[in-house]
Design a protein with these regions (language model features):
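Vicinal oxygen chelate
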Residues: 1-8, 30-83, 89-123, 133-148
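Conserved beta-strand-loop-alpha-helix junction that forms the acyl-donor binding cleft
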Residues: 12-15
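Conserved active-site tyrosine of GNAT-family acetyltransferases
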Residues: 19, 23-24, 92, 127
């Protein structure tokens, strides 16, 4: 079944079939296992792992700390590193997914380094923000290319 990540988010979804299709057919996740009787699936894309489960009102195992209203997942985004962000962006556009942040190149400082990414943010069917990014490498904060 492969290695399981040490941190995995479980996303409550309003339409399990639609969400499963989005994550597998549009974003390229593969299903590691499922529990059809619970409308649950454990998904993986190159080590990025998530669980999706159908939300049912009154389910005592939903672990909801407050009122659940759409869009779900407000206040956070999930960053998923991919090898070909352009192809994934094209897949999302072709599917008609809502792009929240257009494709951009962004450099983030980490101490004396800048880490570059090409990224965009898409909303899943329930409004969870997914930041899909591809590494552009590193460079010195001074702008000088790093040796190596």
């Amino acid at each position: 079944m492969g290695d399981m990540a040490k941190l995995v988010v479980e996303l409550l979804v309003s339409d399990f079939a639609q969400s499963l299709k989005f994550y597998t057919e549009v974003l390229g996740f593969r299903q590691l296992y499922d529990r059809p009787e619970e409308a649950f699936a454990y998904l993986d894309r190159d080590g990025a792992q998530i669980m999706i489960v159908q939300h049912e009102d009154g389910d005592e195992r939903s672990w909801i700390a407050g009122e659940l209203v759409q869009p779900f997942g407000r206040g956070m985004n999930l960053e998923i590193e991919v090898e070909d962000v352009e192809a994934l962006h094209a897949s999302c556009v072709s599917y008609g997914a809502r792009i929240f942040l257009a494709m951009e190149e962004k450099w983030y400082r980490r101490d004396a380094l800048l880490l570059g990414v090409r990224q965009f943010i898409v909303l899943d069917p329930d409004g969870y923000l997914l930041r899909l990014s591809q590494s552009l490498g590193t460079r010195a904060v001074s702008g000088e290319p790093l040796n190596g």
